[in-house]
């Protein structure tokens, strides 16, 4: 099991069943990001740029820039996450079994991770330009037993999977495994990893499942604002090495995000637009 020394995660308790984003983040739109200084803008849009100065010259930085869209491409992706009368973004439905899952034609992306990894906060950040979107959260962390579906117009669907770990429902595997195996329109699975904890044994079980089913997936490091740069760099390098040596279906570049500071959110939006086929980027690998 991989272990990275980092700051202890801050404990967060969710006290209500339904959290509704009342207003968007002040940096939710590219136009506001462009008002920042060049250094702050680069740090926000491409979080790995903050870590580059700490790397030895012999380290290959290209592996962290495989997906590196331009500012204009980030702007284009933002339109996909901006609602309009003809492009409605909202919570659609929930399901507890495969026979309850809606039949949809558009591509899907699903988000998975351990309980309290920051999944709901990340989804709210992605949808921050659509503040009316409802992200449902269990009163007791780790006890969500439903797959929650969010439709982004006719472009794609985002699926919020139940959290796993020692507090997860026992029927997690019975619920999630059939979805991963049978959902033919699943374009990409996003596996969230807490920056303060690194890959845990339960995460490795999920990785084994993705590899067994040959499902394309990507690692997303959450809560990077709570971790020292040295520890974050060590984790990023270890994850990149893990991906290279122990996986075949994982995208080679881990993504770094902070839902609080909004770091990496625009980049992740653009990647989602890319893998769902809604934005074709030049010279980018998927």
UniProtKB/Swiss-Prot annotation:
CDD domains: YihA_EngB (cd01876). One of its GO terms (molecular function) is GTP binding. GO terms for cellular component: mitochondrion. Transmembrane segments: none annotated. The keyword Disulfide bond does not apply. Keywords: GTP-binding, Magnesium, Metal-binding, Nucleotide-binding. Its cofactor is Mg(2+). Mg(2+) binds at residues 120, 144. This is GTP-binding protein 8. It comes from Danio rerio (Zebrafish).
């Amino acid at each position: 099991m991989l272990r990275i020394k980092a700051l202890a995660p801050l404990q967060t308790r969710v006290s209500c069943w339904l959290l509704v984003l009342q207003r968007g983040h002040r940096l939710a739109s590219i136009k506001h990001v462009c008002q920042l200084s060049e250094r702050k803008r680069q740090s926000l849009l491409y979080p790995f740029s903050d870590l580059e100065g700490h790397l030895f010259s012999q380290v290959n930085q290209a592996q962290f820039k495989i997906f590196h869209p331009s500012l204009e491409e980030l702007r284009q992706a933002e339109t996909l996450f901006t609602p309009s009368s003809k492009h409605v973004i909202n919570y659609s439905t929930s399901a507890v079994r495969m026979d309850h899952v809606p039949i949809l034609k558009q591509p899907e992306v699903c988000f998975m991770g351990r309980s309290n990894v920051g999944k709901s906060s990340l989804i709210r950040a992605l949808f921050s330009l659509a503040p009316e979107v409802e992200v449902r959260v269990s009163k007791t962390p780790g006890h969500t037993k439903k797959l929650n579906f969010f439709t982004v117009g006719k472009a794609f669907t985002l699926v919020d999977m139940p959290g796993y770990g020692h507090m997860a429902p026992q029927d997690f595997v019975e619920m999630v495994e059939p979805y991963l195996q049978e959902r033919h329109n699943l374009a990409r699975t996003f596996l969230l990893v807490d920056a303060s904890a690194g890959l845990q044994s339960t995460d490795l079980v999920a990785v084994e499942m993705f590899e067994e089913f040959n499902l394309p997936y990507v690692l997303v490091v959450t809560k990077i604002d709570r971790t020292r740069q040295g520890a974050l760099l060590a984790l990023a390098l270890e994850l990149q090495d893990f991906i290279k040596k122990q996986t075949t279906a994982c995208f080679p570049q881990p993504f770094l995000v902070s839902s609080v500071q909004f770091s990496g959110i625009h980049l992740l939006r653009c990647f989602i637009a890319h893998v769902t086929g809604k934005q074709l980027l030049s010279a980018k690998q998927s």
